[in-house]
Amino acid sequence: MAKTKQNSSFIAVLAMIFLIGMISFVTNLAAPIGNILKMQPQIAGSNALGMMGNMMNFLAYAIMGIPAGNMLTKYGYKRTALIAIAVGFIGVFVQFLSGVVGSFPANFIVYLLGAFISGFSVCMLNTVVNPMLKLLGGKRSNQYIQIGGSFNSLMGTLTPMLVGALIGTLTAQSKIADVNPVLFIAMGVFALAFIILLFVPIEDPDQVKTTEKVESPLKFRHFVYGVIAIFLYVGVEVGIPGTLNFYLSDSVKGAGLDPSVAVRTAGFVAGTYWLLMLVGRLVSSFISGKVSSKTQLTCVSMVAIILVIWAMFSPVSTQTSMPAFTGSGFEMVKVPLSALLLVLCGLCTSVMWGTIFDLAVEGLGAATNKASGIFMAMVVGGGILPLLQNFIADKAGYMPSYWVIVAGLAFILFFAVAGSKVKKA
């Protein structure tokens, strides 16, 4: 009996790890699918409208960030996870329907609805998967969480690559149905995870209730700065590769790549950014015991600012080679140097969430749980900043739009250097 329970728990752990990967998988569908939407004649190449799916995905965090935490208390870990998985399946299915419902604007509206529903799922999954792994994993829970984080980064790497390969050459005839295999994979993983968790017995941990009044974390000035920093960070993290994907895919106003390979190249280059985030997290895990969060955040913020400004002022004619899938195989392809510089920012952004969180909750005590819910709501920055950036890209060009990223990084640097000092507002 004990062995059967252990095997069931291990299967549930695997399901949770796959769901951590699905968080990144579903989130990173938005930018490459945005390339397809941009080609709709009615959208006329608008980067801002192409980024609307990403916006809807992250908008859900502002609505669901704090309630998702309350669901854990009200419904328990298992029921919350099952609800999140079911909502995720529905969200991806609605996105699939957008490829078959007809022409613009109906297909566009249905797609945005699907992205919004998926955002609710991803928000709930972000809230429940790590506590579930901690509960199911026992003494090995931290190891499982680290494996899940690595799988999350791997999915972030593969998603734009896979979507880019499926789209092939971007034309006015490109449609969301071109990426149906990716949507089928997502629905399959959600369905399998739901079935597994449905039949695995999971007991919720005992909740320690307290009558002690918990002070609002917003009374701490450094936490307020940290909330702003998290909002900007998620926007920076998403905006750098998302806009880079648009830039490389755009053969006319962007990087000037061969149209027959531009989208595939863009997917692989953007995917490399997420791969470097994985590398950065691994490096950070080794040095975090010796290098403080303040020092790490200060250094990576400064380096990221230098890389982005360098990329902005690097001529398109200055090129370098990066590996990419061209349709017939993997090759070294020529891309603007700016693309490589922006990809390297993945090493910098990889450690920002953890270090900002660590500095922002310093000295909060019992208010830390409330702080976590506020942070989850601030993930909406991943939708707002990229939308603003691509609105500017439509008006002034791709590279000038990265001033939005520089501004965000500048505030994060301020937070690391001065704003993180523990002090009540």
Model-identified regions with their sequence ranges:
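Central cavity-lining transmembrane alpha-helices of secondary-active solute carriers
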Residues: 51-72, 271-283, 381
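Helix-loop-helix hairpin linking two adjacent transmembrane segments in secondary transporters
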Residues: 139-140, 144-202
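Extracytoplasmic gate region of multi-pass secondary transporters
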Residues: 30-31, 159, 219-275
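Intracellular juxtamembrane helix-capping segments at the cytosolic ends
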Residues: 124-138, 349-365
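Extracytoplasmic
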Residues: 11-43, 130, 240-248
